[in-house]
């Protein structure tokens, strides 16, 4: 995903261009929409302007992997809430129970459960240690639904994630398929659905 973000920036992608491309999306799409991106481009755009434009465009939430929870609480939470934009925080197997409960208390939308502290990418299945982590978080009875991401690329990983959470987040596999299909989103989406079924 990081490679895709770098390539997009090299090809001239900007937040302004993204919002221009999304301006009419709510005429066709009714499901919740969540953007994912790094903090630096958002700061260059202006955090308040970014949140306002998200609201105006119909974006429901934003995942900012490099936004520390402390900074979110101290500097960005009130701005996001004022614009009714949910900031989705990530947790990992190493995140303390205390931090997880704080994230659950002070955010809305869902909690992004990173399946491992390793980089994103395909895995054949989740080992017993990862499944124990998923169960440990489920047993916390959090207020927010949980979504599991990182390494979901086939039926096994998708079903395991879905059994332990409200759903799965699939990024790297889709980016890989987009590359294979020369940017044809329909073909890439069809191949992704096929991979998750078989």
Which role fits each region the language model picked out?
Residues 1-34, 78-92, 128-146, 152, ...:
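Alpha-helix-loop-beta-strand connector modules within alpha/beta enzyme cores
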Residues 10-25, 43-48, 66-82, 96-101, ...:
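Active-site-adjacent beta->alpha loops and helix N-cap segments on the catalytic face
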Residues 33-37, 62-64, 87-91, 111-113, ...:
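Hydrophobic faces of well-ordered beta-strands that scaffold small-molecule active sites
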Residues 35-66:
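Glycine/proline-rich, positively charged
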Residues 54-60, 80-87, 105-111, 163-168:
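Glycine-enriched alpha-helix->loop->beta-strand junction motifs that scaffold or abut catalytic
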Residues 95-106, 141, 152-168:
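Catalytic cores of alpha/beta
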